[in-house]
């Protein structure tokens, strides 16, 4: 996932970077590095993020 995709996903969920990190079960700094493009998101992290976005869409009725 690109940093733009990570940023878009976080905004779709309506979360701050700290809240997104907490929801993902990681530290804020790690999320900031992923979203800033300084380190790649793990495969597990990308899968969890996709699931969170999909769940949010379903709960929102989209």
Segments predicted by a language model, with ranges:
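DNA major-groove recognition helix of helix-turn-helix/homeodomain DNA-binding modules
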Residues: 25, 40-62
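Short alpha-helical DNA-recognition segment
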Residues: 14-33
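Residue-level detector of intrinsically disordered, flexible termini
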Residues: 8, 17-18, 59
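A short, Lys/Arg-rich alpha-helix, primarily the initiator
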Residues: 1-11
């Amino acid at each position: 996932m690109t940093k733009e995709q990570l940023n878009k996903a976080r905004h779709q969920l309506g979360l701050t970077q700290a809240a997104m990190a907490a929801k993902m079960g990681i530290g804020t700094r790690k999320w900031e590095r992923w979203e800033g493009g300084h380190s790649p998101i793990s495969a597990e992290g990308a899968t969890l993020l996709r699931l969170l976005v999909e769940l949010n869409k379903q709960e929102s009725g989209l």
